[in-house]
């Protein structure tokens, strides 16, 4: 697998950011970056984690590196960093405020400093088997993946995507019927759910 480190600004990455599960998922980087490819789990960061990402960027502190896979058509998929990227993207589109300030309430200098922050991104090129092995390796740290989430990474496809769409939301029928039995953070993190 070929791996190269790149510095890409938030401004560049989030040009064309869209978060719409029904219409192509979560995309950025002029539509070339699939932030939530089929093997990725749903967004699971709690508000405190999400806010820490924004706080880190605003203070100019280093944010953990991210990994993207380059596809044959020169598009990219997020291998690691989805939670951080969605945290940033949702902040930029006014989904939440930090200290009662939305992104568009920042001063021009604050907004430019935020947008000019450089993300450290390793771009990886390799075959599907190499990408999966790399995905398993880099996901040892951070928000631990359940075994089922690793299985979901191996067996992607339309069936799994459709099942996740219908059964991995806190307002879905499966969650409403069985929420007392879930011993975790809900259907998004159910360790034994075969979504």
Placement of each model-derived feature along the sequence:
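Short hydrophobic beta-strand that contains or immediately precedes a catalytic carboxylate
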Residues: 78-80
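Conserved structured core elements
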Residues: 47-51, 82, 128
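N-terminal leader or domain-start segments enriched in small/polar residues
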Residues: 1-76, 93-95, 119, 165
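Short catalytic/ligand-binding loop motif for oxyanion handling, primarily in non-cytosolic enzymes
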Residues: 75-76, 85-87, 110, 130-131
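Short active-site loop/helix that positions an aromatic residue
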Residues: 82-98
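Solvent-exposed functional surfaces
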Residues: 68, 93, 100-103, 110-195
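Residue-level preference for alpha-helix termini and adjacent loops
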Residues: 32-34, 38, 42-44, 62, ...
